[in-house]
């Protein structure tokens, strides 16, 4: 907005005529802009719910152009009055033309200063009214110095769209060349720097310089009255106390603000085993963790520096720990079930106890000695067969002992069941001859009673015994033949033994 001092004079009639013509052209352009914006608004009126921001921007732009159009119309009237006054005799009076911030008006002023021949370039953008392009601060300062002081009314007429104090600070810090898109700068507390900036740019303020200075003083007083006004993230009162009562100083440009020292924090309480033991003893005295209070526990512990909060925190942790279910010990593993031999089968002990009662048939283990004795007898005679062939006297003595008749049975035992006869027969086992003939003599009775009372296992045992007895008979027959051939001296004893054996079998 650079302008010469000739703008303030009244002796240039051509200049006034050019300004009037330029304002007429600007009025026509503004009307065209308004008509175009109205057409655009009608186009998107059906979509105003989907495009609320577009409608808002169009309405604001149209309102701004209407205000400028009114200002131009008022300006044209003032220009006509000024032209009429110029034709009258020269009167020395101060005349300040009404100017606006629009870019088109500035271009018209420049064209009029250059001679009025050039026409300003069109910048058909409704955003001009929002001051997205700002003039340099130096040109504004020069123009302000040329114009001199202004009254609040004139200032409001010259600057209908003034900016806020925050934008003033941003423009001053950025040099005024960044436009609307300026980097963010934090608002510091009111100080000498902001006061100087406000004094350097009085035309950008909302109030005159005197009122602005008073407002700055009042704002500084309010900052002093606030005891906890934050300054750069730190409480001002605490910083003032750290500086010894001095107010916080504003750092110079280019220097980093040193971070404030952190306040000393109290060390965390470390509960040693001894301290915890005292804690547990106090709980036992007071009646448990659910009844005791932190104050009572602290008084009983008698520890210097221990606070109720620390005891309370430890008590809560202790309650949580004791409330947690303790891991139960692992149950003892069940002993390996013992197995008992019952009838040749490995069975659990409970079945053995049930089988301990009276059984219909005899238990199998009772027959085990019979097999062992039979095998032992067979092996014995097999090993000594050759010895008996060469010693007839010893053979006759052994045979006589083996076939000796057993004592007679009592009458009540003569009609015993078949298995008792079987056990008596097994008791008489002494020699192969007696076994064979005894088995042969009682074979009929065993066979007749097997179908009625004997089980399958006892029948199988009887069959095995019969086979063993047959083998023993063959061996004893061979032995008797050998004795008969060896000598005539022993024939009498052999005959006697044979007769005795026959009597035992018949018996």
Swiss-Prot record:
Keyword Transcription set for record: yes
Single GO MF annotation: DNA binding
Keywords: DNA-binding, Nucleus, Transcription, Transcription regulation
UniProt-annotated location(s): Nucleus
Chain residues forming the annotated DNA-binding region: 294-319
Family matches, as SUPFAM superfamilies: Homeodomain-like
PANTHER family: MYB FAMILY TRANSCRIPTION FACTOR (PTHR31003), MYB FAMILY TRANSCRIPTION FACTOR EFM (PTHR31003:SF19)
The protein's name in its UniProt record: Transcription factor NIGTH1
The species this protein was found in: Oryza sativa subsp. japonica (Rice)
């Amino acid at each position: 907005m650079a302008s010469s001092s000739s703008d303030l004079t009244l002796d240039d009639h051509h200049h006034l005529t050019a300004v009037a013509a330029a304002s007429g052209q600007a009025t026509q352009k503004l009307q065209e802009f308004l008509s175009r914006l109205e057409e655009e608004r009608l186009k998107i009126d059906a979509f105003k719910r989907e495009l609320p921001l577009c409608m808002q921007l169009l309405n604001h732009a149209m309102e701004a152009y209407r205000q400028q159009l009114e200002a131009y119309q008022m300006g044209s009237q003032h220009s006509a009055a000024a032209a009429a006054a110029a034709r009258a005799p020269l009167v020395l009076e101060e005349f300040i033309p009404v100017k606006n911030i629009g870019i088109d008006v500035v271009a018209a002023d420049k064209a009029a200063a250059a001679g009025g021949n050039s026409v300003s370039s069109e910048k058909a953008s409704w955003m001009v009214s929002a001051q997205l392009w700002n003039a340099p601060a130096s040109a504004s300062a020069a123009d302000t110095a040329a114009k001199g002081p202004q009254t609040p009314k004139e200032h409001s007429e010259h600057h209908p769209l003034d900016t806020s104090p925050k934008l003033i600070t941003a423009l001053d810090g950025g040099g005024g060349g960044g436009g609307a898109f300026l980097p963010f700068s934090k608002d510091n507390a009111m100080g000498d720097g902001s006061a100087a900036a406000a004094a350097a740019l009085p035309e950008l303020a909302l109030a005159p310089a005197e009122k602005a200075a008073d407002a700055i003083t009042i704002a500084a007083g309010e900052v002093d009255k606030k005891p906890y006004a934050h300054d750069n993230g730190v409480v001002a009162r605490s910083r003032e106390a750290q500086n010894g009562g001095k107010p916080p100083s504003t750092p110079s440009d280019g220097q980093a603000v040193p971070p404030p020292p952190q306040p000393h924090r109290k060390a965390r309480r470390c509960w040693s085993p001894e301290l915890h033991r005292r804690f547990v003893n106090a709980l036992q005295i007071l009646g448990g963790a659910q009844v005791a209070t932190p104050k009572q526990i602290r008084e009983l512990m008698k520890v210097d520096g221990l606070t109720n909060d620390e005891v309370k925190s430890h008590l809560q942790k202790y309650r949580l720990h004791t409330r947690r279910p303790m891991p139960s010990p692992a149950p003892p593993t069940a002993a390996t079930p013992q197995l008992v031999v019952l009838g040749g089968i490995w069975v659990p002990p409970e079945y053995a106890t049930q089988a301990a009662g009276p059984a219909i048939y005899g238990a199998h283990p009772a027959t085990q000695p019979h097999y062992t004795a039979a095998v032992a007898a067979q092996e014995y005679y097999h090993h000594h067969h050759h010895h008996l062939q060469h010693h007839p006297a010893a053979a006759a003595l052994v045979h006589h002992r083996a076939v000796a008749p057993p004592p007679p049975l009592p009458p009540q035992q003569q009609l015993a069941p078949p298995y008792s006869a079987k056990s008596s027969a097994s008791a008489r086992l002494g020699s192969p001859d007696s076994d064979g003939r005894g088995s042969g003599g009682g074979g009929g009775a065993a066979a007749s009673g097997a179908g009625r009372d004997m089980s399958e296992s006892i029948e199988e045992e009887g069959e095995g015994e019969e086979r063993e007895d047959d083998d023993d008979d063959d061996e004893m027959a061979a032995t008797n033949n050998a004795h008969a051939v060896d000598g005539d001296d022993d024939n009498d004893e052999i005959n006697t033994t044979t007769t005795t054996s026959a009597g035992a079998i018949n018996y």
